[in-house]
């Protein structure tokens, strides 16, 4: 019995040790898991820090490179006048003299052509880089960046004219294969002519909205410059930019400013306008192919345009924009009143009948004046009386302007 009593505590002690070791192992395993998780987190943070370090080092090198570039001396602008071989070129510096210089091996020899602008090292005058073609700032201002909001739906009474201009301008740019199948060349240019206010410029803006081509617009008077050769240079640069941006459309508004009949005038101003016109004729249908560049021009004085400008090959299609008839005026009135709050007593057909001989600009002014009469009377809607007053007011303003114009002509 004594031996059994002595062995019992040993059994209890063994179980306690077993439980203790089991708990200890469990704690160690949990601790191991925690340490593993911490290790993974630290590895992830380490990779993130290394990535950030690489990024900051890259930015540091970039900033150092920019600082070095800013510290480097400026380069001289020159123009290539002749190419001797792949390593030697004759250039004319901006100061005037010409030099035979070396070219960098990093420059493509095909880019070095006579007339190309380049940068020269100040010390050795070696060609460092080739610059893109430079244009007058006025030329870049002619490029339309944002597409106009006007669409063909905003033009009333000109359905045949819209169809013609779409065939001549849009179709060659969007579906050139149709002309290839038939075996004809698409029209090169379109001339819009007609009385003022009939929608010539509006039609051109709709073309710019409808096509994805680059659109360059210029007023004819902008090409008339003070110094000899400046107008011709603007015309040449305008067409060069259009060729680079091809497919493109050039819209020349009021082309009669430079396209009038050539005569024997001896004034320097008239001779400069004629030089600009001759440059325009050469660009429109000269020795060089114009490429995928379409021309749209507008004028209200087709009778004074030079005959050389009107021949086929320059303007293959001349579209007359006439004064609207009754149905055309009604369509224009519906367009201008679609967002107006008009009363039930307004008869647009009657308004169209009373405005015979008016153009689209006059009809827009009538709608605006009718709205102003309604605002003056503190009404929310425009009634028929407002339209009648607007028609009378527009007619009175026209008669007063005509009287002053005639009076000035009589007693000038």
Curated annotation (Swiss-Prot):
CDD domains membership: RecA-like_PAN_like
SMART domains: AAA
Binding site for ATP: 197-202, 336
A single BP term in Gene Ontology: protein unfolding
Recorded domain comment: Consists of three main regions, an N-terminal coiled-coil domain that may assist in substrate recognition, an interdomain involved in PAN hexamerization, and a C-terminal ATPase domain of the AAA type.
Role noted for this protein: ATPase which is responsible for recognizing, binding, unfolding and translocation of substrate proteins into the archaeal 20S proteasome core particle. Is essential for opening the gate of the 20S proteasome via an interaction with its C-terminus, thereby allowing substrate entry and access to the site of proteolysis. Thus, the C-termini of the proteasomal ATPase function like a 'key in a lock' to induce gate opening and therefore regulate proteolysis.
Protein's UniProt name: Proteasome-activating nucleotidase
Native species: Methanoculleus marisnigri (strain ATCC 35101 / DSM 1498 / JR1)
Gene that this sequence comes from: pan
